[in-house]
């Protein structure tokens, strides 16, 4: 078995781990009523609807 000759520094270890950490882009859909961009599974901030029902007042 191979054994490391030198200890891996914390900076090198963290840099290697950070290379694989990537944020996923935000999934944005259009509101079926007002066609504004909305995050999925949330009420529309512009018209206040969620799943076709009026939840909050329009802002």
Curated annotation (Swiss-Prot):
Q: Name one GO cellular component term.
A: large ribosomal subunit
Pfam families, A to Z: Ribosomal_L32p (PF01783)
Protein's GO biological process: translation
Keywords recorded for this protein, A-Z = Ribonucleoprotein, Ribosomal protein
What Gene Ontology molecular function terms does this protein carry? structural constituent of ribosome
**So which domain of life are we looking at?**
Bacteria
> What NCBIfam families has UniProt attached to this entry?
rpmF_bact
Family of this protein: Belongs to the bacterial ribosomal protein bL32 family.
Listed PANTHER family: 50S RIBOSOMAL PROTEIN L32, LARGE RIBOSOMAL SUBUNIT PROTEIN BL32
Instruction: Report what the protein is called.
Output: Large ribosomal subunit protein bL32
The species is Anaeromyxobacter dehalogenans (strain 2CP-C)
Q: What is the lineage of its organism?
A: Bacteria, Pseudomonadati, Myxococcota, Myxococcia, Myxococcales
């Amino acid at each position: 078995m191979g054994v490391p000759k030198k200890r891996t520094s914390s900076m090198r270890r963290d840099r290697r781990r950070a290379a694989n950490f990537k944020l996923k882009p935000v999934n944005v859909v259009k509101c079926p009523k007002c066609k504004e961009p909305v995050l999925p599974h949330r009420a529309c901030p512009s018209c206040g609807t969620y799943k076709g029902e009026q939840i909050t007042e329009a802002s």
